[in-house]
Amino acid sequence: MAIIMAESSYERRVKALYEKQIRMEALEAKFIKKVYKFNSNLLDVKEAACRHQRKVGKLQKVLMERREELDKRVSFIEELDRELEATKLRDLAMKDRIKQQKMLARQRKNEIMESIHTLSKTTETYINQDALPARVKGVTVLRGDKRNQLIPFDLKSTDVEGLDSLCQHLESLNVDIAQWQQLISLAMDVAMESRAPTTPPKEAANCNSIIEIDLTSPTCHI
């Protein structure tokens, strides 16, 4: 009887140990499964982190490129602003120079017109401005005690011989040739300037205040 009870107690202990081992193996398997799942999740997290890091790197690269492009555009705009300001200053300077040149031109023209008026009175010579610069047309008055003599002239502006002949003729009549030539030259300059930049007539293409006179035409008296 004692032997049977001893064996029964031994079986219970063995059975308890076996059941305990089974529970331990089940717990171990469950733990291993959890560890595997954790490692798998950790790997997924690491891969996701790597993908995110790569995206962040690409975004940073794009951001840096955009920033460099923006800096270049800002520099370009600043350069354009400087060029625009410089252009405005040049335009202002040019306008000022043009204004000064126009003022000087008006002043010079007024001085020339005054000189022409003075020389015209001094030499008693009156020029037809509308005929210039193609022709030199006018009349010189020689004052006399009893009567005045008119010497008309209607000349091309390119004949050297005509100029020489006219000068000799006027000089023989005691006309101040230097002042007379100066009058014609100034009148020619005014006519040339007033017609610039239009193309001058063919007759005046080589004009240098050179005139001619037809001495065969009769003089007039008053």
From Swiss-Prot:
GO cellular component, one term: nucleus
Cellular compartments annotated: Nucleus; Chromosome, Centromere, Kinetochore
Coiled-coil regions listed: 51-86
Protein name: Kinetochore protein Spc25
GO BP field: cell division; meiotic metaphase chromosome alignment; meiotic spindle organization; mitotic metaphase chromosome alignment
TM regions (residue ranges): none
Subunit structure: Component of the Ndc80 complex, which is composed of Ndc80, Nuf2 and Spc25.
Keywords: Cell cycle, Cell division, Centromere, Chromosome, Coiled coil, Kinetochore, Meiosis, Mitosis, Nucleus
Protein family according to the UniProt entry: Belongs to the SPC25 family.
Main location: nucleus
Encoding gene per record: Spc25
Function statement: Acts as a component of the essential kinetochore-associated Ndc80 complex, which is required for chromosome segregation and spindle checkpoint activity during meiosis and mitosis. Required for kinetochore integrity and the organization of stable microtubule binding sites in the outer plate of the kinetochore. Participates in SAC signaling that responds specifically to disruptions in spindle microtubule dynamics. The NDC80 complex synergistically enhances the affinity of the SKA1 complex for microtubules and may allow the NDC80 complex to track depolymerizing microtubules.
